[in-house]
Design a protein with these regions (language model features):
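Predominantly flavin-linked oxidoreductase catalytic cores and closely associated redox partners
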Residues: 29, 116-256, 292-293
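Short beta-strand to alpha-helix junction loop
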Residues: 56, 96-116, 236-244
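A conserved beta-strand/loop capping segment in the N-terminal third of enzymes
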Residues: 64-112
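N-terminal Rossmann-fold NAD(P) dinucleotide-binding loop
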Residues: 23-24
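C-terminal helical "tail/cap" subdomain of flavin- and related membrane-associated enzymes
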Residues: 316-370
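Conserved N-terminal glycine-rich FAD pyrophosphate-binding loop of Rossmann-like flavoproteins
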Residues: 47-70
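FAD/FMN-dependent oxidoreductases across multiple families
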Residues: 130-132, 237-314
């Protein structure tokens, strides 16, 4: 589905590295606010759509509002969820909010989003990997596995293990959250999530030293009901016990009669944004997981879409005033709904993993949509 340009030596003004929700959202917002800049933007994606991404698959929060604002309607298999069930040992609490989550498969979601952008003119180069960058006067020389580009602005939207971020040589230490996940066909004897259209977040592992939770999320895969089973260890407090993720997850899967070898489990980190993190340098912005998401649960799709909006506005302003220092980028993000929500979740993560406040109380606060 790559849209190619016959002039391989062309220099763009802007490059986006990564074709996930954050990268595509950045381009779609540029196209909405400043079409002339969108025309001078190239997006490179190291893989070819559709490609798998480890993700719980919940499109929640204010995601639908952003997609509506962008005029994007996604015709993909979806399951709408109205109930979030929180568990902590034998305690249980349910938060009911009509259609608060839309459960999708990331390979289908990302592919559909990219198609919308291409139909509006996105220059997308698939199977092209970012390798390095060097400063050249007030611009950047970017090298990929296919060619070199001379650009004014580089957006790192290449995930938690961002190569762009690594090449920026930032001073702050990363907060990476390990996760494990498997997908299994729903078994009505053990899995009630699909039939009851609910998401289960189980914080019981906190009792075993884990600073995190187990999730069970229903979805549709190959036209069949499936459940995504996963575990995340947030490690918000570095001085506390880490807990044994694999042992806890194995026990949870066995309780649902799931016997999948560990070598078949998927694993990929989530990056959480800390207060002192640097997410920009002159000519360079980080978005989505490359920048970081909230440290209470590690939820990310609504953050990815929001980063795109903030980044696009920041870039438009930079071109208008000819100042590419991007010194105001983090402040712009902190002032945005996503930034304010992240600050709230950081406070709640401290309450949950450090202060020992009831997970059921904290979880409701995290997911309550005002």
């Amino acid at each position: 589905m790559t849209k190619t340009n016959s002039n391989t030596d062309v220099d763009y003004e802007i490059m986006i590295v990564g074709g996930g929700p954050a990268g595509i959202s950045t381009w779609l917002h540029l196209h909405k606010y400043y079409p002339e800049l969108a025309e001078k933007t190239v997006l490179i994606e190291k893989a070819k759509y559709p490609r798998d991404k480890l993700c719980g698959g919940g499109v929640g929060g204010w995601s639908e509002l952003i997609l509506k604002h962008l005029g994007v309607q996604l015709d993909i298999p979806s399951l709408f969820i109205s109930d979030l069930e929180f568990r902590y040992g034998k305690e249980m609490n349910t938060l009911h909010q009509p259609n608060c989550f839309r459960m999708i498969r990331r390979n289908e979601f990302d592919h559909a989003l990219a198609k919308h952008a291409i139909n509006r003119g996105l220059q997308l180069n698939e199977n092209e990997k970012f390798l390095n960058m060097n400063r050249r006067n007030k611009s950047l020389k970017v090298k990929t596995n296919k060619r070199e580009y001379l650009i004014k602005t580089l957006i790192g939207a290449d995930g938690a293990l961002s190569i762009v971020r690594r090449k920026m040589k930032l001073p702050n230490k990363s907060h990476l959250v390990p996760t494990l996940e498997i997908f299994a066909e729903a078994n009505s004897r053990y899995d009630s999530e699909f039939d009851e259209k609910k998401i289960v977040l189980d914080f019981t592992p906190i009792k075993e030293g884990l600073q995190g939770y187990i999730w069970h999320t229903p979805c549709i895969k190959d036209h069949k009901p499936f459940i995504g089973h996963g575990i995340a260890n947030i490690r918000f407090c570095k001085d506390k016990s880490k807990g044994n993720m694999k042992e806890i997850f194995t026990k949870e899967l066995l309780s649902r009669n799931i016997h999948i070898e560990k070598k078949l489990w998927s694993s990929h980190p989530i990056r959480c944004l800390s207060e002192n993190d640097t997410i920009s340098k002159p000519n360079i912005l980080l978005v989505g997981d490359a920048a970081g998401v909230e440290p209470a649960t590690g939820g990310g799709i609504h953050f990815a879409l929001s980063y795109g909006e903030v980044a696009a506005n920041t870039i438009v302003n930079a071109f208008q005033i000819n100042d590419f220092s991007f010194k105001d980028y983090k402040q712009r993000f902190q002032s945005h709904l996503a930034g304010k929500y992240l600050a709230k979740c950081t406070y709640l993560a401290n309450q949950l993993y450090v202060q020992g406040i009831s997970p059921l109380e904290v979880a409701r606060e995290i997911f309550m949509i005002n």
